[in-house]
């Protein structure tokens, strides 16, 4: 018999009754039923119930063990009585009558419980992450992550991609988020950077003639944490393809993503390919966001002209100054009390906006300050154009276009949730396309890149030379699922002359481009194919599939919101010897010990 186990803790069934077996695992729960001691033994695979009589040689040893001690149990598989069969447990028809127990490791008193899913302070959970990971939900999330990555790999290889690894130590880039810097011992005063993404390397691979590249890529960005973003590092399905159009990229990755979500989505509905395409301007108009959640059926309308020179002076004044008015429908909201509408207005103020106007309709009668000031005819025309019913409501966001769109988008989400309109048990994908290439920076008083400076402008050099920069669109796209951005991507600008011109419009001369992006721009001068790709976030995919609200619930050893690893004590001070080797001196001494 094996020294530790003949089976795992999820393997035994009624067919094994009468067999002598050996299991190893953690003491999950103990129950003393007056002369009978029951122990739930847990391993990676599941649970098996162990039973010992009070006159058994192993009773006292089991009774004295703390939860989470690691033991090896030898005994006979016996059938449970019908009244104590547990249909919710894979091994629920049997139990092991213990004859031998060997303690492999004693557990101290636990700082947090493993059994159950009690909500516990996050700092404790992260400090003792190895205990937290024993909990069933979190354990399943990490296994799910492993399976998702394996499925992504298989599907990409089936599409003709090869997996390659790009460098982790690279050069710092002036674009994007803050870099994590690594000092060089050999070159004092110089620094490597951890890659924010393998962007330049994967493009250089296309220049080198590798046609289809992918990797599960670690990425490092010194940026603040959010619910859907880990501080420090994250992983993405990074891929790039040569000689492709935007539609080729879409057609390649859609079946990969749809397939993974169908495989691991637990029967939830998944948007079939091809995914809907929504222009950026339409996304901002109809959904108030470039990350639209299509589970929400509500669409925003522009009603600016209804308020131009209208009787509602507040909105009329905003429109006269170049502002806009956006309407967010609220089906059947008129059946609610006025408090529903006032609460929405108060919520908007709490979010930092001036407020949210509204009209509530009860049995066909429009109420509220806006309806009174607009007048009956203008109000009825507005409601008719919006297609509202006799007990609907509508909210209004007014102001500068960007601000009004943002408020309208947030209000759309909130109304959808409050009125229970969000489609359940579904994953709704879409592409957001036709992003603007440039935008105007009010503070700097100049045109800057709107998003990705390395994407190909639609219309190429001709567009850059003849069109207003603010009218130029880019071959740039985002893939969104349930309101969460999974990836940005683009058809790349592979022509040096077009790249120089695009950067010139954004205020960079040729010397600056050559200095900051020498590796890529020089490579493009030796023959570069048209190419494009994207990089869907693995962490966010798993978060959606696991139904978790926070990305830290699907990461093995995450940092906290302050970018601290409480378990390993990072970041931490280093010795003077280490600093001297790197030719570094700390200008500001840390005032307190972090991650302690």
UniProtKB/Swiss-Prot annotation:
One biological-process term from Gene Ontology? aspartyl-tRNA aminoacylation
| Gene Ontology terms, MF aspect | aspartate-tRNA ligase activity; aspartate-tRNA(Asn) ligase activity; ATP binding; nucleic acid binding
Cited SUPFAM superfamilies: Class II aaRS and biotin synthetases (SSF55681), GAD domain-like (SSF55261), Nucleic acid-binding proteins (SSF50249)
**Chief localization:** cytoplasm
The protein's matches in CDD domains, at most eight in alphabetical order, are given as: AspRS_core, EcAspRS_like_N
Q: Which residues lie within the region annotated Aspartate?
A: 199-202
Q: Which InterPro entries match?
A: Aa-tRNA-synt_II, aa-tRNA-synth_II, aa-tRNA-synth_II/BPL/LPL, Asp-tRNA-ligase_1, Asp-tRNA-ligase_1_N, Asp/Asn-tRNA-synth_IIb, AspRS_core, GAD-like_sf
Task: Report the EC code(s) recorded for this entry.
Answer: 6.1.1.23
Enumerate the residues marked as the site Important for tRNA non-discrimination. Answer: 33
Give the protein's biological function. Aspartyl-tRNA synthetase with relaxed tRNA specificity since it is able to aspartylate not only its cognate tRNA(Asp) but also tRNA(Asn). Reaction proceeds in two steps: L-aspartate is first activated by ATP to form Asp-AMP and then transferred to the acceptor end of tRNA(Asp/Asn).
Q: What is this protein called?
A: Aspartate--tRNA(Asp/Asn) ligase
Organism, per UniProt? Zymomonas mobilis subsp. mobilis (strain ATCC 31821 / ZM4 / CP4)
